[in-house]
Regions:
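Short, compact, well-ordered microdomains
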Residues: 53-100
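Conserved mixed alpha/beta catalytic, RNA-binding, or beta-rich assembly cores of soluble enzyme
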Residues: 1-49, 71-74, 91
Length: 100
């Protein structure tokens, strides 16, 4: 979270495109862990629903959403969450303080 917020506040890395805009963090979430999929975890579903209700201009995924830092491949749980946001018309951006 520290690297993400630092990049956001400084409008660096993946937040550079917003350098001339006023930004507001509407939500900050982490997944519920490996093996917790949407539709199977009530707590995760509630987190997703709250973000869908807010309908932010974009959702940024941090490098911590990857299976590991080496492959830079999103884990299956996060891929499913991102797909839900995309279907709702919310752009999903890969990266905060790092681009992957």
């Amino acid at each position: 979270g520290a690297g993400c917020f630092s990049a956001l506040n400084g409008r660096t890395h993946r937040f550079r495109e917003y350098r001339d805009e006023e930004l507001q963090v509407s939500a900050f979430m982490k997944c519920s862990g490996c093996g917790h999929f949407p539709g199977q975890d009530k707590g995760l579903d509630e987190k997703i629903e709250r973000i869908l209700e807010i309908h932010p201009d974009a959702v940024h995924l941090g490098i911590c959403c990857c299976s590991d830092g080496e492959s830079r491949t999103l884990c299956k749980e996060v891929e499913m969450i991102a797909a839900i946001f995309k279907r709702a018309g919310i752009p999903v951006v890969r990266g905060t303080h790092s681009v992957f």
